[in-house]
Amino acid sequence: MKILHIALTDGGGAGMGLMNQHRALLQLGVDSRVLVAIKQSKDATITEMRPNQNVWGSNKYVVLLQKIARRMGLSFNLYDRTHRDIYKIKKKIAIPFSSPITQYDVSRHPLVDWADVINLHFISGFVDIPSFFKNVKKPIVWTMRDENPGLGGFHYAETKQVHYKEFSELEDKFLNIKRNAIESCSNLSIVSLSKIMRQFCDGVDFLANRPNTIIYNAISPDDYTMFKRNEARHELGINPDNIVLSFVCCQFSEKRKRFAEVLEALDILGDKHIKLLCVGKRDVEITSPNVIALGSISDRRRMSLVYSASDVFVTPSAQESFGKTVVEALYCGTPVVSTSVGIAAEIINENNGALCGGTPSEIAEAIRQVLGNKYNQTEIRRLATEKFAPENVARQYFSLYNEILKN
């Protein structure tokens, strides 16, 4: 069985899930390869693809003329025009918004010919949707790592509701491009990372009638260590007598993560001994003396220290396709307070935390509830490992690939 995974990159959160799945498949004896636009590791089973040759040739003078034309706002092709239009809007509104038109004709790569099954992952900015679904006739599995496959350019439906007015023309155009491309494909199956993601797909006209299997994201427990709480606090320089909450996001200004609501919840709790550890880009002003901003962290050992030092991990997101930080915290034995989104809706219960609403008062009440309970940290980690360990996830994918090939 030859499986080709296609993704924008082997790095980042989505890339980590892909690579855990890929390596676990290799351990099962599957001939698994990865094709990316941006390679961040030295893994020999990963191939990096460069953009297509310039449509006007490789003559250096022609290339120079194109660059000058682009700076003047002129366009030679659909790729140039769509990305010029996106850039104009994103200068004013900095949100993820991607075109289905790219400079990569992935369908013609030799690894596509090599594979028995092609597994798409996060492909925004890499795979040219129209040419790929037109030319590839092999079985395709698309792992939904966010909601972009079922939208035009937006990556989350909640963001679309807020910013549709500014992007309406492009969103409608991109949605029609995707719809036409995917409707012409008879060999597509979907993998949803959670029940909520599957429900989203069921509401998209061109995805609803596709076979859709729920397989959780692969997250390795070996990457996250359950430190003793006081040891973790000592290493991070945190008072062992404090009550510690933690919060993680890419950047604090990302409204979907509800950082502002968490700060208000901290005020509602009204205890000067409660400290909030925040991981992410500090791009908003923080005046509370009870907030400890740690900046962005990529080192998994240090992230393990943050989770392990916490009495509660708080993640009241408005929307998540999966929510891997929930699993990371559970691997460290830390109970979680989360809204009922992504994977949290399925796994958070009285044994490992609490679900909450998205208002500051609801978040504060759930934090109080969790702080008032006692938890078995070892059991929290064990149950999470059963669900999300890469070897367990890989077996489910192996069964899915086999079923598709038999049919």
Please name every model-derived segment.
Residues 107-108, 135, 148, 159-191, ...:
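Membrane-proximal helix-turn-helix segments that form the acceptor-binding/catalytic region
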Residues 191, 239-257, 263:
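Conserved donor-binding/catalytic core segment of Leloir-type glycosyltransferases
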Residues 280-304:
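Nucleotide-activated donor-binding/catalytic signature segment of Leloir-type glycosyltransferases, i.e.
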Residues 305-310:
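Short alpha-helical donor nucleotide-sugar binding micro-motif in glycosyltransferases
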Residues 318:
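Aromatic "clamp/platform" in nucleotide-sugar-dependent glycosyltransferases that forms part
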Residues 335-338:
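Short hydrophobic beta-strand element within catalytic cores of glycosyltransferases
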Residues 350, 354-360, 369-374:
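Conserved acidic donor-binding segment of nucleotide-sugar-dependent glycosyltransferases
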Residues 374-399, 403:
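A short, well-ordered alpha-helix in the C-terminal region of glycosyltransferases
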